[in-house]
């Protein structure tokens, strides 16, 4: 069980100020597109020097050979987790895993973004079936082609574990202290909800980064995440 703090900042200066002025050195962190595309691999090196576990959330989605070569470079960074899109297909997923074969980095596949609702699935993407059915299918595709796990809202974790095996990892973003606080993610949850359905990892962003007291918010989220199973 690991809780990642989403470093949704535009540059290293703001990231550094947030982490180290708030006594958050060494906490597991998520680096997304905004920060990585601004700072490049150097941000990973800086975070590793300060003993952070790192979830690199780039959601790669390209032709298989391009993703394979990108993953070989990502493998050299030594991050703990990295994401791709399952909608790139079986060969892309397999080539992504192949690019990581000499590293300890785990491959996590995105099924449907947590910002997507049934309206988008049915009328914009025109995918057959509802969200749970599509997520289960894409999770099975990811597992069959070597992925270590998938990104999943709390609503799909149980079905993924049932379909793919309990050892198949699930990472749940969109964690809030109040499940009605949705912002731009439609399928959100609290730390307790994620624990109770069996999520292996969670990502907490605004609830910590926009708090007046980030360290206190971090400790509260961590406590709620870790202790929910004891209730």
Swiss-Prot record:
It is an enzyme of class 4 (lyase). One of its GO terms (molecular function) is orotidine-5'-phosphate decarboxylase activity. One of its GO terms (cellular component) is cytosol. Its EC number is 4.1.1.23. It comes from the Bacteria. Catalyzes the decarboxylation of orotidine 5'-monophosphate (OMP) to uridine 5'-monophosphate (UMP). HAMAP family: OMPdecase_type1_B (MF_01200_B). This is Orotidine 5'-phosphate decarboxylase.
């Amino acid at each position: 069980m690991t809780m990642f703090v989403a470093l949704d900042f535009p540059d290293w200066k703001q990231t550094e100020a947030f982490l180290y002025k708030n006594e958050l050195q060494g906490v597991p962190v998520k680096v997304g597109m905004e920060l990585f595309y601004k700072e490049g691999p150097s941000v990973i090196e800086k975070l590793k020097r300060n003993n952070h576990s790192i979830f690199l959330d780039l959601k790669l989605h390209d032709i298989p050979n391009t993703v394979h070569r990108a993953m070989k470079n990502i493998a050299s960074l030594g991050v703990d987790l990295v994401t791709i899109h399952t909608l790139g297909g079986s060969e892309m997923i397999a080539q992504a895993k192949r690019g990581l074969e000499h590293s300890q980095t785990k491959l996590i596949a995105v099924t449907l973004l947590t910002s997507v609702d049934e309206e988008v699935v049915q009328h914009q993407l025109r995918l057959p079936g509802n969200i749970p059915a599509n997520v289960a299918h894409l999770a099975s595709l990811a597992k069959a082609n070597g992925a270590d796990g998938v990104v999943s809202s709390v609503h799909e974790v149980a079905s993924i574990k049932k379909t793919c095996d309990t050892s198949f990892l699930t990472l749940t973003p969109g964690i809030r202290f109040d499940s009605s606080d949705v912002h731009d993610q439609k399928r959100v949850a609290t730390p307790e909800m994620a624990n109770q359905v069996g999520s292996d990892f969670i990502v907490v962003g605004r609830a910590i980064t926009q708090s007046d007291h980030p360290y206190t918010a971090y400790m509260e989220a961590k406590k709620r995440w870790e202790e929910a199973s004891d209730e």
